[in-house]
Design a protein with these regions (language model features):
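Helix-to-loop junction immediately C-terminal to a conserved catalytic motif
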Residues: 46
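Conserved ABC ATPase "signature" region
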Residues: 104-122, 173-174
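ABC ATPase NBD coupling module
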Residues: 62-77, 98, 104
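Conserved beta-strand-loop-alpha-helix hinge in the C-terminal portion
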Residues: 207-230
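A short, proline-enriched helix->beta-strand linker immediately N-terminal to the Walker B motif
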Residues: 145-149
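Conserved ABC ATPase signature
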Residues: 126-130, 134
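Catalytic Walker B motif of ABC-type/P-loop ATPase nucleotide-binding domains
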Residues: 151-155
Length: 230
């Protein structure tokens, strides 16, 4: 369970106040206008941005006081950040170690991660030899190899076409359910949220709150979000 209490975050005069909320296992869509603070929220939890105040408790520890590498969080960004000169196998292995040589156990773990995202047989290819969807799968495999209980997704599939994006969303849902992860997915697409998100978080007017069940939340748009949804 991830519990947020008295959390304030943002830049300059744009400080967002998050309602006290507890997130259990499941997928949460994070929806709001551009510049509302969606990505900053994820970056604050991950440790890439400092909070103004408050706490984010997981297993009796405040994430906001931990070093980035010690937080139980893995994050996937819009850019897949694959190194073009390295093979897909080596790119994924970087989640475990930067050393050139891996133990047999580590090699098996990398292979298993690639197999899980449907990239078995692509180990020796370079990122430039893969399609956009396959590159997204490789980036997801690298995140999975970190074995973190909280997964933050900052529009990682926004550049993909509808069919490939849906494929990746379905894969995330399958993995989240199997691993009982807490997943926060930033998206501008209500369709994406309806497809895989159990619950929805709205961010607007310097406020972040859990709106509840995704289908119900998107059928009953609050006044603060009317301009965004149109």
């Amino acid at each position: 369970m991830l519990s947020i209490k008295n959390l304030k975050f943002g830049h300059g005069s744009h400080i967002v106040v998050a309602e006290n909320t507890a997130f259990g296992g499941g997928i949460y869509g994070v929806i709001g206008p551009s510049g509302s603070g969606k990505s900053t929220f994820l970056n604050t939890l991950a440790g890439f941005h400092n909070s103004e105040s408050g706490s984010a408790m997981y297993e009796d520890r405040d994430l906001l006081t931990q070093r980035v590498e010690d937080r139980p969080i893995a994050m996937l960004f819009q850019s897949n950040n694959l190194f073009p000169h390295l093979s897909i196998f080596r790119n994924v292995a970087l989640a475990m170690t930067s050393r050139r040589w891996l133990t047999k156990v580590q090699q098996r773990q990398v292979s298993d991660a690639l197999d899980r995202v449907g990239l078995s047989g692509f180990e020796n290819r370079k990122p430039g030899e893969l399609s956009g969807g396959q590159q997204s799968r490789a980036a997801l495999a690298r995140v999975l190899l970190q074995k973190k209980p909280i997964l933050l997704l900052d529009e990682p599939f926004a550049a993909l076409g509808p069919a490939m994006r849906n494929e990746m969303l379905d894969l995330v849902k399958e993995i989240a359910e199997t691993d009982n992860q807490i997943v926060l997915l930033v998206t501008h697409s209500p369709d994406d949220a309806l497809r895989i998100c159990d619950q929805t978080i709205f961010v607007s007017n310097k406020r972040l709150w859990l709106a509840g069940d995704t289908k119900i939340a998107l059928q009953n748009i609050p006044s603060e979000m009317q301009d965004y949804f149109g």
